[in-house]
A protein has these predicted regions:
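Helix-enriched interaction subdomains in cytosolic or periplasmic regions
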Residues: 4-25
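Soluble catalytic domains of membrane acyltransferases
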Residues: 12, 17, 33-191, 199-200
């Protein structure tokens, strides 16, 4: 019987691979394989990447994302709502690569991320531009500012529940006009449906 490989570390260029244990990498690949989801495409071989993932409509997105990060073995830091970094869980989520987002102080967050990126020769910063699982009309533009200040490429990652696939899409080069860039990106993602499509 032909074995279907839905995820492979070879989808990540060497300079963007993490230093996770073989066990964690196997857990990631096993989790994706038994879930029936597939990772399509490859992470581009760029020095610095700001990765945005959408549509974000379910708590399951986080679990799928962590399995994919482990399986692909990406060297990544991700932004998450500060409320999940509670005492007892804070160290765990930071170990997973998490950076808490305090929405009342966005400039401090951007400064923090910029400092993290500057310390690394190569790294991926991941975030969800909607900023919430709820349906929103206008996405946040922090990722555009972070990409500009860190001289990073923007990588579009889509979650498509009907096909059970996470698609590693194309690199987006900002024009400098945040409104036009955001409109283009939101239109790109409009063809994909999240796990809870009514929130897309």
């Amino acid at each position: 019987m032909l074995k279907i490989m839905r995820i492979s570390e070879n989808q990540t260029p060497e300079r963007l691979r993490g230093s996770r244990s073989k066990i964690l990498r196997k857990i990631g690949r096993f989790g994706i394989n038994i879930s029936g989801w597939t990772i399509k495409g490859k992470i581009p071989d760029e020095e610095r990447i700001v990765l945005i993932a959408a549509p974000h409509t379910s708590n399951w997105d986080f679990i799928l994302a962590m399995l994919a990060i482990f399986g692909l073995n990406i060297k990544v830091r991700w932004l998450g709502k500060h409320s999940i970094f509670k005492p007892g869980f804070k160290k765990f989520f930071e170990w997973l690569g998490g950076i808490p987002v305090y929405r009342d102080n966005p400039s401090s967050l951007i400064e923090n991320v910029v400092n993290i990126v500057k310390k690394e020769k190569s790294i991926v910063i991941a975030m969800t531009p909607e900023g919430t699982r709820k349906k929103v009309k206008r996405w946040k533009t922090g990722f555009l500012r972070i990409a500009k200040q860190t001289h990073s490429k923007i990588l579009l990652i889509s979650i498509d529940a009907p096909t059970k696939s996470i698609e590693i899409g194309k690199i987006f080069n900002p024009s400098g006009n945040s409104e036009e860039d955001l409109a283009y990106i939101q239109k790109y993602y409009s063809t994909f449906k999240g796990i809870n499509p009514q929130k897309s």
